[in-house]
Amino acid sequence: SRDWSSDVCSSDLDRLLMVISWNLPQGHDLDRYFGYIVKAPLRQNNFFGLKRRKRLENEPKVPVISKLQEQTLWYKTKPEFFSGNKATWPGMLYTALIPCDSYYLLLGWNAKNKYSQFKCIEVLWYDSKQEPNFGKNVFKIPKKNPKRLVFEYSKEAQMSLRFDPGQNRIIYSHLGPVDENPAMTGQFAFYGPDGSFDALNEHDNRWILEEAIDVRNKRNKNDYAPKPNHTEEIQLYPRNK
């Protein structure tokens, strides 16, 4: 049997929000997900001891704790277009929190079943009543208008999904079927990374897809320094004449 996992996400850039999530195996290779969101007030010191800007309209004066109730099997039908709230939460285990203007991005993972799993870029935003909602159109993807991005792949594979704060973009493995047979398209139990990477770049508070990026480290001036000539003799001590 598998052990349960948990994670706590907060952002060093914002420090106004903390998300706690965990999963419990339920048998038959299915997991249940549980979570809380703790939203700190803006004007007072929050739980990180950081003072923020003037309070917004309807902004609570004390930290608000929202219990998340999973919408079971929410991913069965068009998961990228599902809209949720704290009572119909698209459950997953969150691993990173990215603050944006008027919303947050969450990087998450869901075990799904014994054949496939998925990672997700979720959108968390608050309405006028300061209630949390999940899913929003902040992505600019050709021929799509998703409320979140879902990457499903084989249970045997490993996918990279991370935020690069230096370049303010999300980098992730490009997935594809292990076999080029067209019949494998959409059979996600046979999907895995193909060795290339894509990225989402933030522009005007939206995230724009950039395909086939170069993930190699950029060279700096020290990389072009002349290399030592190892054929030359280095005399540490003068020879006796």
Please give the residue ranges for each predicted region.
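Single conserved hydrophobic/aromatic residue that forms the stacking wall/gate
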Residues: 1-8
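Short consensus segments that form the blades of beta-propeller domains
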Residues: 25-31, 85-87, 111-116, 186-191
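Beta-propeller blade signature
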Residues: 33-44, 120-130, 185-204
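Short N-terminal edge-element motif at the start of the domain
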Residues: 39-100
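Short aromatic loop motif centered on NTY/YTY
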Residues: 93-100, 112, 133-202, 211
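Gram-negative outer-membrane assembly/targeting C-terminal domains
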Residues: 211-241
